[in-house]
């Protein structure tokens, strides 16, 4: 793994896992297979090693979830962002496309090799896993009661984005611990789902102190 700005210019993936485990209060041994898959191989990371380790430690339990996505290009863009920030993604089926779709791969490029993806056959299957993790479900919706900038995010939140064509059904609304919206001009429907994901995840990262800074600041 190549790390831009590190003292040596190189940072072995096993060392990265050790740093991450220590940052999370775990043992100093190598990390599990999921993280190894997420960061495996050589990869350019645009941050000093110490800042990336802090970022990864804080974001290790924060997740994005996509509810029955319709458009492969949006999903590919979100997966690329998640790879860059080290955020796992839950994809809740059925999806409107195959995960090997050419359009998805075109949007995600080679970043698919660097993101942890968990696929769930249904919302019920996803909920069983989420509840076992003990993570809050934070729904991003045009029907949200609170602006995302006014919400206090937690490090283990799961940020859920609805289907492009229909959002999420009432069952999913009821399951959410919080329903957030992005303030917009009146008369306009909604933002692109990938843009919305970037805006809200960026705020969540800022709140929990995981925003990377340049060495000069």
What are these regions (language model features)?
Residues 1-2, 17-24:
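Polybasic, low-complexity intrinsically disordered segments
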Residues 22, 26-29, 34, 42-217:
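Post-transcriptional modification and biogenesis factors for structured RNAs
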Residues 5-9:
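Intrinsically disordered, low-complexity segments enriched in small polar residues
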Residues 15-17, 31:
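Cysteine-centered motifs
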């Amino acid at each position: 793994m190549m790390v831009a700005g590190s003292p040596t210019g190189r940072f072995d993936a096993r060392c990265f896992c050790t740093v991450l485990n220590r940052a999370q209060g775990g043992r100093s041994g190598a990390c599990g297979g999921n993280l190894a898959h997420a960061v495996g191989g050589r990869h350019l990371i645009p941050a000093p090693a110490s800042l990336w380790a802090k970022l990864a430690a804080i974001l290790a339990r924060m997740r994005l979830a996509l509810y029955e996505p319709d458009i492969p290009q949006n999903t590919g863009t979100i997966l690329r962002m998640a790879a860059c920030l080290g955020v796992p993604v839950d994809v809740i089926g059925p999806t409107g496309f195959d995960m090997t779709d050419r359009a998805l791969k075109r949007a995600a490029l080679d970043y698919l090799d660097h993101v942890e993806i968990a696929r769930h056959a249904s919302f019920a299957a996803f909920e069983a896993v989420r509840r076992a993790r003990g993570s809050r479900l934070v729904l991003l919706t045009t029907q949200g009661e609170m602006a995302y900038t006014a919400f206090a995010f937690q490090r283990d939140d799961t940020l859920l984005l609805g289907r492009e064509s229909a959002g999420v059904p009432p069952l999913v609304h009821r399951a959410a611990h919080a329903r957030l919206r992005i303030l917009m001009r009146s008369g306009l429907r909604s933002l692109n789902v990938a843009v919305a994901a970037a805006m809200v995840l960026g705020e969540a990262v800022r709140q929990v102190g995981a925003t990377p800074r340049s060495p000069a600041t």
